[in-house]
Amino acid sequence: MVPKLVAHRGWASRWPENTLEGLMAAVDAGAEYVEFDIQLSVDGMPIVLHDATLERTAGRAGCALDMRWDELKNIKVGETGRLGEVCPHARLPSLSLIRDWLATEPEINAFAEIKTESLSRFGVGRVLEACLQVLEPVLDRCVMTSFSDEVLLAARQQRETSIAWVLERYDEQSLIRATSLAPEYLFCNYRKLPGSLDMLPAGPWQWVLYEVSDAQLALDLAKKGAGFVESMAVGELLSDPLLDSGSETF
């Protein structure tokens, strides 16, 4: 069985993560599922960014949660230290920009992960409302995703939207909570799985395991019950003969 592939922050092995350019590159390579991260600026603008701070992707000091959108919109996040001159002028995108792109790609589904730093700073209600308002036109193709089960419960109560819970730990308590939450998708770092695990526990969810960059590993995880694997190297996996699209899929 061949799992479906999710582009983790876009085609992040080759392109700047969480940028329009990186997401477009993933889709151009054949990805049908993308994932991106959402933080909130101090003036309430949802932005697409993994870390709350700017050091890693922008190479400069500062916390995005303390800055206004007018300050953030021209910040370059081309990750030149990691990627060189692949896309040096890529700018930190607003969620609105990514939404507008998704609106032009009707076959693409997105996992929109709300980051816990913004939830802690601004509160579940404010962050969720800002995200849902922006994503409303494409919400039928977006899965609200988070480590926070609280924001996912609120999302489900406010909208008829699919949710994905990201496990901090793979243990009995987390699985009991997952059964109660009943998300459509359950994310987990595959390295957190017990080595003795033969089959992932079934539930109302589909399993999404990350961070996977090896085709044989993707197949092995699929045998354990993973319907999806998430990868920053999505383009490489899509072109790997082991994961040929002509093979049997979920």
Located regions from the model:
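Phosphate-group recognition and catalysis centered on beta-loop-alpha active-site segments
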Residues: 1-250
